[in-house]
Amino acid sequence: MPNGQPLRIDFVSDVSCPWCAIGLASLQRALANLQGEVTAQIHFQPFELNPQMPSEGENATEHLMRKYGITAAQVDANRAAIRARGEALGVAFRMDRHSRVYNTFDAHRLLHWAELEGRHVALKQALLRAYFSDGDDVSAPATLLRLAGEAGLDTARAQQILASNAFAAEVRAQEQLYQQRGIRAVPATIINGRHLISGGQPPEAFEQALRQFAAAA
């Protein structure tokens, strides 16, 4: 049986980050494998890879080529590697040269509210699936409202939030906090506010770390 308080896991990530989707799936599999041994509570913290992205988004291949100075062939190779990692975790990545990258700030605002309602994990999974598997525009209010409903949230309240600046200040404050703590890349998984696990690690790496931190807690 698990002992003591549940581990606090702060998962810093962006909705448009494929390695964040892989990292979350790995973390969740690790926690499932450790059921009865380790208990934990996941909290999602916001990080925007492209905070200046316009509302219409941008072709993802062109964006990655310009941002990282790589070729279209290298983008394709990276996607193939991500697809393979995803398949092993049951995550379907259907990205291609027509995929687009979108602004994710409103998605982060909804996620902040969803945690207050206890539905943040369901919404996060819905957002990742919509973007990476279905190719949906996760900046579009209609998409966000549909996903909020799928996650068991009140869509009327979600619509009010999206039509206002609700939780914008809170999201900005959290983004700034984790930047001040040195988080420059995501995913970043922080255990009990002290231990950092960087990147989309495989489940066994999370298992080992979580078991170690739980024993030391």
Where do the model's predicted regions map?
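C-terminal cap of thioredoxin/glutaredoxin-like
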Residues: N3-G36, A40, F44, L111-A217
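Structural alpha/beta surface segment adjacent to cysteine/selenocysteine redox centers
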Residues: L24-Y131
